[in-house]
């Protein structure tokens, strides 16, 4: 419900549809909302993956106020889905699957997004290409300078969310 409330004000219907297409698939959405984000590092409780992902999306929005609105929403959605591959690389208890031992969760995540990206391309080709560019940078950040500098915010927001959760757990 929190993700739906966060996404509701998005003025880009094709982007909202993209998120619903991804998270509406039971094989993706169910684990996304119930799995931990990690086994023991951060957000390691049931539902931690969705909590962490939404924190990243919100932080990205807060960090990108000087950029055009469409770039902010595209990057925030990429932040929301940056760890989506964990639904294939982790088990409900946070241990890695055999696939997760072989392939990064970032790459598995992009693989999961491809069908929805293809549908997004039919209604908003520039948006689909922007997401491809952002996820390309997320998968291999040291390989290139991002054409969309907002992509760098995902990495920072990811670390901030993880560190903040560790701080909460340490001092609670």
Where are the regions that the model predicts?
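A generic short-segment signal for beta-strand/edge and adjacent turn/coil regions
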Residues: 24-25, 46-47, 123-124
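Short helix-to-loop capping/linker segments positioned immediately adjacent to catalytic or ligand/cofactor-binding
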Residues: 6-11, 43-47, 61-69
């Amino acid at each position: 419900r929190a993700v739906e409330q966060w996404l509701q004000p998005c003025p880009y219907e094709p982007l909202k549809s993209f998120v619903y297409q991804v998270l509406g698939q039971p094989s993706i959405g169910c684990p996304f909302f119930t799995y931990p984000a990690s086994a023991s590092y951060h957000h390691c409780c049931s539902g931690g993956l969705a909590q962490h992902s939404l924190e990243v999306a919100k932080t990205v929005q807060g960090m990108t106020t000087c950029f055009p609105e469409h770039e902010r929403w595209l990057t925030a959605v990429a932040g929301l889905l940056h760890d989506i591959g964990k639904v294939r690389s982790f088990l409900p208890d946070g241990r890695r699957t055999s696939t997760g031992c072989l392939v990064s969760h970032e790459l598995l995540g992009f693989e999961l997004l491809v069908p929805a990206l293809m549908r997004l391309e039919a209604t908003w080709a520039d948006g689909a290409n922007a997401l491809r560019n952002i996820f390309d940078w997320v998968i291999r950040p040291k390989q290139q300078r991002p054409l969309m500098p907002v992509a760098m915010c995902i990495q920072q927001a990811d670390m901030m969310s993880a560190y903040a959760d560790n701080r909460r757990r340490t001092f609670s």
